[in-house]
Structure formats: C-alpha cells, structure tokens
From Swiss-Prot:
GO cellular component, one term: nucleus
UniProt GO molecular function: DNA binding
Positions with biased composition (Low complexity): 241-257
Major localization class: nucleus
Key words of the record: DNA-binding, Nucleus, Transcription, Transcription regulation
Region (Disordered): 5-50, 212-257
Pfam families listed in its UniProt record: At2g31720-like
Cellular localisation: Nucleus
Protein's organism: Arabidopsis thaliana (Mouse-ear cress)
Name this polypeptide is given: Putative B3 domain-containing protein At2g27410
Cited PANTHER family: B3 DOMAIN PLANT PROTEIN-RELATED, DOMAIN PROTEIN, PUTATIVE (DUF313)-RELATED
Residues making up the signal peptide according to the UniProt record: none
Polar residues: compositionally biased ranges: 8-35
Classification via InterPro entries: At2g31720-like (IPR005508), DNA-bd_pseudobarrel_sf (IPR015300)
Length: 257
C-alpha cells in the first residue's frame, strides 16, 4: 500500500509538470475570424482592368490652331511700318479675371506659349530684371485689339502659384473699354507677335473671323482666298514701302489730310 501511494504521488508530480493551454478546445471568436479573412488578398480581375483606359484631358480649343498668319494680321503688320516676323504666341481663352478692370492685366502662362523665342536678348533681360525688382518697368509694346485700335501696353512676367506667366499691364483697361461689347468670357482669340518696321515688339489679338479672304477697311482690299487658298507670308519691308503711311486704325494717312 505504501508503494502504491508512492507511485500515485510520483505520477501526480509527473502529470502536473506539463502545462496545458487553458484555451484548448475553444472555438475561435467571430472577431478573430473576420480579422483573418480581411488579411487575405482578394484576387484581381486582370482582364477587367486591362480594358480600362486612362482619361486624357486636352486643353479646350474651339478650332485647330492656325499657324499661318491670317490676312487680317498681315494687313495690320503693313500698317505698322511694314511689320515682319509674325509668331503665334498663344490661343488665348478669356477668363473672368481677364475682363475685370480691377485686375487690369492680360496673362499668358509660360506653359501656353507656343513660340517662346519672340523676345530679343535685351527684352528678356529687361523683363527678368523687372521680375527680380531690379528694374521698375517692363518692355513697352504696341498692342492691336480685334477692333483695330492700337494701344501701348507693358509686358512683364510674374510668378503666380509657383508658375511663371507673361502679363500685359499699364493699358489693358483701355483695351477692355475699346472692346467692351466684343469680349465675352470663354471667348478664344489667337495672340500673335510681330516686329514693326523699326523693330519694335508688337502684339495683335486677332478676331475669330480673321482667316483667309477677309480684308480690312482702308487697306489694299486684296483677297488671298483664290484657287490656291494660301495666305502669303510677309516679305522684306521694302516690298510694302508704299503703305508705310497707314496706321493701325484702318485709315490711311491720306484720309486725314
């Protein structure tokens, strides 16, 4: 009996030497099941995703860009002492801020400039010095509006929201007054630059219907909408020396005498 009790005691100590999991035999809780399921990767439908195309947003333009100078512009250039070297700067859409007199400027972001080499080295330096507050004024330019009125504006560059833009100031209010019945928000106007016969930097905001076959009042009246449909590019100033006395208002100098 003593031996039996001793054996029982030894077995008792041996049995208690092994530690058992107190949660053994319990069912997993619903929360642990959801957590485990959420970690599993969901299969990707490759075939469905392969058919998706990324939407590309293009800038709004009412019509294809006309890189050939319209006749309206060529006639304006002839009146600017036989202007030359036309360049398309931007297809400019008018926004509400452009039409507000309190803003008093027309802006053209650098990213929208189609021909960036329209400035000379001196003009580039002057505009840069003005932007750096080294110089008070920018570059004075002649600006012809769609109604054929010529204005004297100033071209500068500003940095707005981290981006550089060209701005026409000091006279833009006069342009708004001259075209107050014409300019509408969201209208699109091609903005061109050219040089007058003396080399002065000029700009023209051409009207929408300034394409082939249109001539200006007071001009030579020639139409270039013939069989070829081509608009001639400006040629050296000496070719148009007979028209050098005309102004941008559409009236020749002879009519004022």
């Amino acid at each position: 009996m003593y031996a039996c009790a001793r054996t029982t005691k030894i077995n008792h100590f041996r049995g208690t030497s092994t530690t058992q999991n107190p949660n053994r035999g319990l069912e997993p809780s619903p929360s642990s099941y959801v957590t485990r399921r959420s970690k599993e990767k969901r299969p990707i439908n490759v075939e469905k995703r392969s058919h998706k195309k990324r939407k590309i947003i293009c800038p709004l333009e009412e019509e294809p860009i006309q890189t050939t100078p319209p006749e309206w512009l060529l006639n304006v250039m002839r009146r600017e002492e036989n202007g030359y070297n036309p360049k398309l700067i931007s297809t400019r859409q008018l926004y509400k801020t452009d039409l507000k007199k309190t803003e008093a400027r027309l802006s053209v972001p650098f990213k929208q400039v189609k021909t960036p080499d329209f400035l000379t080295e001196d003009e580039t330096r002057i505009i840069h010095e003005n932007a750096m507050k080294i110089r008070d004024n920018g570059v004075p330019v002649n600006f012809v509006d769609p109604e054929l009125n010529k204005h004297v504006l100033e071209l500068r560059k500003w940095k707005m929201k981290g981006n550089w833009i060209y701005v026409f100031v000091k006279g833009w209010k006069n342009v708004l007054d001259a075209c107050k019945t014409l300019f509408k928000e969201d209208d699109v106007y091609p903005l061109w630059s050219f040089r007058s016969g003396t080399g002065k930097l000029c700009f023209a905001l051409t009207p929408k219907n300034s394409g082939r076959g249109n001539s200006l009042p007071g001009g030579d009246g020639a139409s270039t909408s013939g069989e070829s449909g081509q608009v001639p590019l400006p040629i050296p100033p000496a070719r148009y020396s007979s028209n050098s006395g005309q102004g941008c208002s559409g009236e020749s100098s002879s009519s004022s005498s």
